[in-house]
Amino acid sequence: MKYQPFFFLLFLMSFSLFSQEMISEIKPLKSEKWYGAFTAKAFCNTPLKDITFQPYLANEMKIDLRTNNKGNQAAPLLISNKGRFVWNDEPFAFEFKDGSLILYSEFKKIEAVTDGKTLRDAYLSAMKKYFPPSGKMPNELMFKMPQYNMWIELNYGQDQPKILKYGSDVISNNFPTGVFMIDDIWSKDYGNFDFDLGKFSDPKAMVDELHAKGFKVMLWLTPFVSPDSKEFEYLAKNNCLVLKKNTKNPALIKWWNGYSACLDLSKPQAVDWLRTKLTNLQATYGIDGFKFDAADFYFYSAESPVFPNEDTNTTGPIQAEMFGKLGAEFDFNEFRAGWKNGNQALAQRLQDKGYSWDELKLLVPDMLSAGLIGHPFTCPDMIGGGLLQNFENIDYKTFDQELMVRSAQIQALMPMMQFSVAPWRVLDEKHLNIVREAAQLHAKMGNQITELAKKATVDGEPIVRHLEYAFPNQGFESCDTQFMLGELYLVAPMLEKGFTRTVKLPEGNWLDDLGKTHSGGKTINIDVPLNRLPYFKKLN
């Protein structure tokens, strides 16, 4: 489901809610670099020249974690490659000035903690204290096989015949079956949690058929409630909705599908109501899980018509955190926005990307950042991205099929792999075969990826790892075009148009995907024909 940022977010990036700030200045150590706080680098289709990547630069604009999650996961955590970290249970604002990290908080003066000498040392110390592993993970199928989301192909036209056809097309095109996500909108109203029988004549039979084909079925949802629905009347009466600022009346909040009321997830009765609706869907139709969308911080910011009031003084981050706590109760789940849910049994997804080479370049950096704030179970968005306009009225003479191939290859050796646009619709046979091979590679590696996920439930370490995390002090501080899959595989996908790239190998010996051994500690040039995803297995 497409997330649309609003114009005032640019203002939010420099705006602070804190009326009585306590300011901390963390002076830089020699060659120190800082990472963390956010998964995303920018909102969808931000020009690449305007994007700052991690590690942060010596001078960075102030960003307020209370109002801005950049459309993705966020955490009150910053970590450095010199073994230092910053954590605060409450959201704070931060900026960089001439290399110094400046922290702003209304709760307490924030100090840096030193525990080790490397990025990994800093992460492990913070993780063990503040977001230790839960011992649980999303269902194994989410890692073992590709996922299929109906957003791009069906958008707002989700219905039973089209959904069943997509499932059949997966099989007839020899793609592995896996998780199947029905997207927006399958009910009559937002906040209504039953199938629209005008579009779904027999939902139980549909789910049964998808199960028989080898799929598990998830449904999309948000905390929003249509204000003209019967659910709104009930929820308002039972004090389950976010209220308008300084009143006891339900607020109407602007989001990408208009104006709606919103469940107040800090209210136990609201969470209980939603939980009951979801478990009823499971009991009635055999639904396996849910895609939890929205809960972005800006819906509840100073510029929105909510908080504070006599009823509640909660915040956007708290709403997102509570949404995640509910989602963790379901074996199959997916989240895009989140707060302080590190190492919980949540499948996180990168925010929607556009279909361009510039947007492709964000996948690896965002996945690396997700790992560094405690999200090992992450999906790198939909293959090709999640923008409808990129796949409507396609001119097949000019459509860039190479980009679709490289997008699929990037995901093949990541924790999760998700299709939405049907590759058999937009690709010729040559390019479709290569994308199919990428899906089959993910399935082939599925058991190994699942073992990494199981390991993360115990040790809390990322699955997709920054090279600086894995190989400190070897010059990888700013390396964001390649990544480690666990401890064993270095993956170096193509991120721009062409058929050659450089790969910087850490010290040691490495066996590449073609069977050739390389001595590390140097940069090599490699050929990357269209059907190749370069990866290197660590030897010894």
Language model features: what each stretch is:
Residues T52-P55, P176-R436, E468-F471, G486:
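Aromatic- and carboxylate-enriched substrate-binding clefts and catalytic-loop regions
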Residues D64-R66, Q73-A75, G135-M137, S168-V170, ...:
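Generic recognition of flexible, low-complexity loop/linker segments
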Residues R84, P91-A93, E153, S187, ...:
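Short, glycine-/Ser/Thr-/acidic-enriched flexible segments
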Residues P138-E153, N249-C262:
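N-terminal small/glycine-rich loop or linker at the start of catalytic domains
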Residues D169, N173-N174, E209-K216, K325-L326, ...:
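Carbohydrate-binding surfaces of carbohydrate-active enzymes
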